[in-house]
């Protein structure tokens, strides 16, 4: 990220991610259409879809380059969150979090070529898991992830605790 516009966008993302997520922001078509599960996981409602890919905020992963491993995804996730001044660490569904924390879960879809073709994030805050798919409104999942993803072709990579 080198341009003035990119720096301003990053500042706005940093500002929104350090506040409690306001889900009513997704009621506007602009926010709904220009954010995804990754921006939702980090708590950003800033309209800039090209930055909401793991590794893009930190500038470590070009948009057109595929992901090669879950380890790479995790490393890039940590780099992105560091760039917006959020602390992220491994966690579990059972771990209790404080008021200034929330959890995210990272899922990947791996195809026959063993490359990661897609990722998905969910967010845990106020005792509930929720998610956002592309242009849709956030959706409540419930208090546990255990039943939600048994039928999905997604693989859970990890659950992470985020501190604002």
Task: Give a label for each model feature.
Residues 3-86:
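Cysteine-nucleophile protease catalytic domains, especially the papain-like/related folds used
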Residues 46-50, 114, 138:
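An almost-null, non-specific background feature
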């Amino acid at each position: 990220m080198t341009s003035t516009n990119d720096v301003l966008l990053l500042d706005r993302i940093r500002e929104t991610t350090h506040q409690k997520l306001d889900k009513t922001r997704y009621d506007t078509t602009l926010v709904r259409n220009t954010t995804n599960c990754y921006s939702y996981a980090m708590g950003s409602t800033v309209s800039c879809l090209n930055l909401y890919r793991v590794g893009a905020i930190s500038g470590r992963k070009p948009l057109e380059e595929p992901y090669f491993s879950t380890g790479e995804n995790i490393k890039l996730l940590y780099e992105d969150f560091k760039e917006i001044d959020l602390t992220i660490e491994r966690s579990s569904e059972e771990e209790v979090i404080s008021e200034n924390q929330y959890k995210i879960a990272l899922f990947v879809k791996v195809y026959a070529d063993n490359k990661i073709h897609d990722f998905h994030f969910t967010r845990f805050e106020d005792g509930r898991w929720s998610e956002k798919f592309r242009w849709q409104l956030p959706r409540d999942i419930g208090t546990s992830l255990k039943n939600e993803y048994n039928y999905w072709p997604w693989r859970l990579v990890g659950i992470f605790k985020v501190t604002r």
